[in-house]
Amino acid sequence: MLHLLVTGSRTWDDAAYIWKILTQLYLNHGAIELHHGACPEGGADQHADDWGNAFAIQGAKVSVVPHPMDRNRLGKGAGPVRNTAMVKVIEGLLYKGKPVACHAFHRNNSRGTNDCAYKALVAGIPLVTHVWNGDAAIQTVHEEQLALFEAA
């Protein structure tokens, strides 16, 4: 089972692209535990959540683990605190020898996506970024972690 962290811009509106990436990961691994930030404004988190729930309903080995931020208690600092918590969950699985990865769907220079992706990279979690360039997404596997990603 792949333990996957999805982070992304709330303005990422290409659901089909995210569904394509997640479906390919599912086909490669046979099961996914999908963690995401549960952004209430939609975007990449919502597309990932929709994909996970749609596949789970059809009997696929997919579980969805949303990590909503506590904006009422933490105010503007809620996003980075939530990102740290999500990364720590995945990092813990990495240290237990579980296959893990982070896919970051980045658009409009999203600070939250940058924050979460950077924290994942520092934690040693294999990171793939998908950057929306206006017409299409460009996928980048971070070279220093390519061997880790291929092993996941």
Listing of model-derived features with the role each one plays in the protein:
Residues 2-3, 11-150:
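Acidic/glycine-enriched connector segments
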